[in-house]
C-alpha cells in the first residue's frame, strides 16, 4: 500500500538512483552480454568439431550451422518475444529464458550427434531471442536521453569485454577438446541468479496513461519506419560474421596457426568493439547519425582490405580490431537511433525486429559468403566486402552532407 502512495516523481527519482548503482549495472549488462557470448565462445572449436564429424555428409556446412543456426531461431522468435514483453512485462520472461539459454548451450558438451547438437542450438536460439530483446528493452526502460546513450555504450563495452574473455577461453579450451567451450554456457546460471537479485520490472504507468501513451499503445506498429535500420544492421552482421565463420579457417588453413591463436584473434575484435562502444556518446556529440554510420562502415571495409593485401598473423590481429571498432559503432548507433524514434509502448516490439535483423545477418553470413569462397577463394570474399562497405560508407557521407545543406537552406 505504501508503494502505491509514492508520487511518480519520487518513484522515478528512487528508480534513477537504483539503476545507476554499480552492482545494478553489472547485473544488467552481464545479462545483455550473454547473447553475444552465445555465438563467439564456440567459434574457435569449429575446425576441430568439423574434423570430429568428418564422416557426416555436408559437415563443411553443418559445422558452420552450429554457430549460426541459433541466429535463425532468434530471427523467427524475436518479434514474438517483443510482443509478449510489451504486453506482459520483461522480467517474467527474462529469467526463465536465461536458464534455458544456459542449459541448452551446455548440452553440446555431452551430445555426440551433430543433428542433436543442432536441435539444442535451435532451442538455444529461441531462449536468446527472449534474453536479448528483454535485456535491451530494460536498458531503454531504465535510462533516458544522454543516460541512455551512455548505457548503450556501456552495454556494448560489457558485451565486448565478456566476448573477448570467453572467446580467448574458448580458444584455449578448444585446443584441449572441441567440447570444452560448451562448458562456458553454465556461466549463464550464475548471471541469472545475480540478475534476479538486482533487476526489477520497470514502472509502466498502467493506471494513469497520458493521451500520447494511449495513442502509442493503440497505434499500429509502423514496420516501414524502422526498415532502413533493419536492412543496414542485417548487412553489417553478414560482414561482421565473416570473422567467426570464415577467418578461423583462414588462420588455421592459410596461416597454419592453432585453435588457441584463433581465440586470441577473435578477442582483438571484441576488445575494439567494446572500446568504441564505450566512447559512442563522445562520437555522437561530434558527429551525426549518418557520420557515425560512415565511419563504422569505413573501419569495417579497412579490415577486409588489410586481409586482402597482407597475409600474416599480425595483420589479421590489426584488421580484426578495425572490424570490431566499426561493428561496435554501427550496432550502438543503430540501437540508439531505434530507441529514440520508437514509441514507448512499442519499444520491445521494435527491438524484437532489430534482434531479428542482427541474427538474420548472422545466419545468412555463411550462406552468402561460402559460395563466394568456393568460387573465388577467401581472398575474393575479402575484396568484395571491401568494395561493398566502402561504397555504403560513401553513401552515408553523401546523405550527411545533403542533410547539412538542407539545414543551411532552411536557416
Question: At which residue positions do the language-model features occur?
Answer:
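Conserved MFS/SLC helix-loop-helix module at the cytosolic interface between two early adjacent transmembrane helices
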Residues: 75-113
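Cytoplasmic helix-loop-helix junction between adjacent transmembrane helices
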Residues: 114, 120-159
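Helix-to-loop junctions at the C-terminal end of transmembrane segments
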Residues: 77-89, 276-288, 373
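Paired small-residue
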Residues: 100, 104, 115-123, 314-322
Amino acid at each position: 500500500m505504501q508503494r502505491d502512495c509514492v508520487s511518480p516523481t519520487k518513484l522515478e527519482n528512487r528508480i534513477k538512483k537504483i539503476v545507476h548503482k554499480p552492482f545494478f549495472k553489472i547485473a544488467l549488462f552481464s545479462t545483455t552480454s550473454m547473447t553475444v557470448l552465445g555465438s563467439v565462445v564456440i567459434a574457435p572449436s569449429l575446425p576441430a568439431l568439423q574434423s570430429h564429424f568428418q564422416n557426416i555428409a555436408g559437415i563443411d556446412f553443418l559445422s558452420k550451422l552450429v554457430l549460426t543456426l541459433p541466429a535463425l531461431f532468434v530471427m523467427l522468435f524475436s518479434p514474438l518475444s517483443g510482443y509478449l514483453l510489451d504486453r506482459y512485462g520483461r522480467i517474467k520472461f527474462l529469467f526463465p529464458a536465461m536458464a534455458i539459454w544456459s542449459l541448452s548451450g551446455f548440452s553440446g558438451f555431452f551430445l555426440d550427434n551433430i543433428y542433436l547438437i543442432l536441435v539444442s542450438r535451435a532451442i538455444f536460439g529461441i531462449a536468446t531471442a527472449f534474453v536479448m530483446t528483454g535485456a535491451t528493452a530494460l536498458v531503454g526502460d531504465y535510462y533516458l536521453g544522454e543516460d541512455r546513450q551512455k548505457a548503450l555504450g556501456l552495454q556494448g563495452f560489457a558485451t565486448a569485454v565478456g566476448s573477448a574473455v570467453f572467446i580467448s577461453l574458448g580458444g584455449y579450451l578448444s585446443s584441449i577438446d572441441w567440447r570444452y567451450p560448451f562448458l562456458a554456457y553454465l556461466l549463464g546460471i550464475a548471471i541469472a541468479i545475480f540478475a534476479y537479485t538486482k533487476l526489477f520490472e520497470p514502472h509502466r504507468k498502467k493506471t494513469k496513461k497520458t493521451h500520447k501513451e494511449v495513442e502509442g499503445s493503440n497505434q499500429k506498429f509502423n514496420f516501414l519506419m524502422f526498415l532502413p535500420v533493419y536492412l543496414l544492421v542485417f548487412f553489417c552482421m553478414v560482414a561482421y560474421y565473416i570473422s567467426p565463420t570464415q577467418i578461423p579457417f583462414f588462420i588455421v588453413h592459410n596461416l597454419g596457426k592453432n585453435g588457441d591463436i584463433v581465440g586470441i584473434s577473435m578477442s582483438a575484435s571484441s576488445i575494439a568493439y567494446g572500446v568504441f562502444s564505450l566512447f559512442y556518446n563522445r562520437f555522437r556529440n561530434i558527429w551525426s547519425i549518418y557520420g557515425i554510420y560512415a565511419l563504422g562502415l569505413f573501419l569495417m571495409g579497412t579490415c577486409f582490405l588489410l586481409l586482402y593485401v597482407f597475409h600474416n598473423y599480425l595483420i589479421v590481429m590489426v584488421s580484426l580490431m578495425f572490424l570490431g571498432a566499426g561493428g561496435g559503432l554501427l550496432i550502438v548507433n543503430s540501437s540508439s537511433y531505434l530507441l529514440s524514434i520508437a514509441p514507448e509502448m512499442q519499444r520491445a516490439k521494435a527491438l524484437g525486429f532489430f534482434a531479428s535483423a542482427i541474427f538474420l545477418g548472422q545466419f545468412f553470413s555463411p550462406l552468402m559468403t561460402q559460395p563466394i569462397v568456393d568460387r573465388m577463394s577467401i581472398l575474393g570474399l575479402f575484396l568484395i566486402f571491401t568494395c561493398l562497405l566502402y561504397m555504403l560508407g560513401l553513401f552515408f557521407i553523401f546523405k550527411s552532407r545533403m542533410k547539412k545543406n538542407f539545414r543551411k537552406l532552411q536557416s
